[in-house]
Amino acid sequence: MLNLIAAVDEALGVANDGGIPWQGKIPTDAQYFRDQTSKGIILMGYGTYKEFDSPLHDRENFVVARPDSGELKPGFVGVPDAAEFLDQHGHDLVWVIGGAALFAQTLARADQLLLTRVVGDFHCTKFFPTFSDAFELQSEASPHVESGITFHFESWQRTVPATQ
C-alpha cells in the first residue's frame, strides 16, 4: 500500500527555497507524522533527505538518489528509481514523505493521501500535485491552532484505480 503524507498550504504549497515555512511551529502535525509513519517504510527525495541530520527513528529510510549524489548518511539507503522501488515493495506499507517532485512522480500509484491542510498562502515555490479527481475525502479533523497557524488533518482514499 502506498501512502503520501504531506502538509500543504491553501495553494498546495509544501515548501519554498528556505524549507517548509511552518517547520517546528505546529508540533501536533509533527506528532501526527510520527504516529502515522512509525514502524513503516519511508521514501523521500534527495532534497528532503538533505533536511535530516539522521534517519527517522522506527522507520526504514530510503532515499531516491542518483549515483553521483555521493555516500548517504548512516541509516539511509539509496535507491536509484522510485518506480522500481515501489514495484519491489508493492505489498508493503510505504510512505512517500516528499519532496514535491517525488509526490508528483508517485501520486498515480498512491492508495491514500494524508494531508495536513495549513490555512493561508505561505508563498511556496514547491507544490503537491492536484489530486481531487482520483481521490475521495474520507475524513477531516477539527481545526487546530498552534503558533498562530490554523491547520487540520485530512484523509483521502483513491477511488479511481491506480496506475503502475
Show where each model-derived region lies.
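Enzymes that bind and transform nitrogen-containing heteroaromatic metabolites
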Residues: M1-Q164
